[in-house]
Amino acid sequence: VPDPERIRSIASSFGWLDARLLHEGWLGRLGPEALGVLVFLVLAADRRGASYYGREKMARILGVERRDLDRGLARLVELGLVAHRRWSQHQQDGVWQVLPVPDRGPGDRHGPSPEDHDRRLPETLAAILSKLTR
């Protein structure tokens, strides 16, 4: 240990991340927005994994644009790492719950990774342009 005099100890309140996020490839599937939001939700969660922060406040605390926060939240829900229940039908905000890491790895979940989107972008643009020039 580089600094044995300064070993961390658990304070009165703490959050924890399942090590399977690292060892089973989840981190690479999240993308930076979702990873930042997941860390925030874990730190803000109560013992049931629930957090009651609104989207505007989360974005402000994280120092990100609202659209980036929304993209991160959507990715977490898509991968089954977070659940959401709205306060009402007419409000986007509500309760966010950090869920246990699914038993099957992220490669088994539906939806391409952010890297997959980046790799396919040139192909998608080429297909659109070829249709326009016909």
Please annotate each region the language model reported.
Residues 60, 78, 87, 102-134:
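Short, low-complexity, charged/polar intrinsically disordered tails
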Residues 36-40:
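Pre-recognition alpha-helix immediately N-terminal to the DNA-recognition helix
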Residues 1-32, 47-50, 57-61, 116-131:
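Positively charged, structured surface patches that bind polyanionic biopolymers
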Residues 15, 43, 65-67, 105-107, ...:
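Intrinsic disorder/low-complexity signature
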Residues 24-33, 43-102:
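Winged helix-turn-helix DNA-binding recognition segment
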